[in-house]
A protein has these predicted regions:
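Serine-esterase "nucleophile elbow" of acetyl-processing enzymes
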Residues: 1-32, 42-48
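Acidic/histidine-rich helix-loop elements
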Residues: 29-37, 150
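Alpha-helical cap/lid subdomain in secreted, periplasmic
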Residues: 39-174
């Protein structure tokens, strides 16, 4: 529901549609209601896309750290095998305001982000080219206005997410 833009006030305010307008490209969003769980079937579906401009891997909010560790590289490799030169962007989960008060939640997000970062570093070290990383820091701001429930993006949350990720998208598309 985060990826599908479930709490945007209208479809055009979901971040995928904003990115589509910003880049003048069609964006396919394969995040369905809590199901960004590194399922290999989704990686195969992504790999089957003809002539993609780039891929954004934003599964961290729904995955567990253990799942990222055990399946993240295989998920990536399925896509990379089909599209060896296409840019792939890895995105961290955002630290929403509730994590200031809920240390368990903060630790959970931190451990998932650390696994994502470790995966990215392993791939870079192994010689992977054309991969990019978007850290969580500064993603949504700290005023509490970016989410409806400390999880799902409001319109302003979608806009802030796009503002945070667009410099990396632009760099990847050069």
């Amino acid at each position: 529901s985060i990826l599908q833009g479930g709490c945007a006030s209208r479809p055009g305010m979901a971040f995928t549609n904003i990115i589509s307008r910003e880049t003048d490209r069609t964006v396919f969003n394969l995040g369905f209601s809590g199901n960004a769980l590194l399922d290999m079937e989704i990686a195969e579906l992504m790999a089957s896309v003809k002539d993609p401009g780039l891929f954004i891997l934003d599964y961290v909010p729904n995955s567990k750290a253990e799942r990222i560790q055990e399946a993240g590289e295989e998920f990536f490799q399925i896509i990379r095998k089909a599209h060896p030169d296409v840019p792939i962007i890895f995105v961290e989960d955002s630290y929403v305001p509730r994590t200031q008060f809920n240390t368990k939640n903060h630790e959970d997000i931190h451990s998932r982000n650390q696994e994502q970062k470790a995966l990215f570093k392993r791939l870079k070290k192994a010689g992977e080219k054309n991969i990019y990383y978007v850290p969580a820091e500064g993603m949504l701001g700290d005023d509490g206005e970016a989410t409806v429930d400390s999880r799902h993006f409001t319109d302003i949350g979608n806009v802030r997410y796009v503002e945070h990720i667009m410099p990396v998208i632009r760099k990847a598309l050069r």
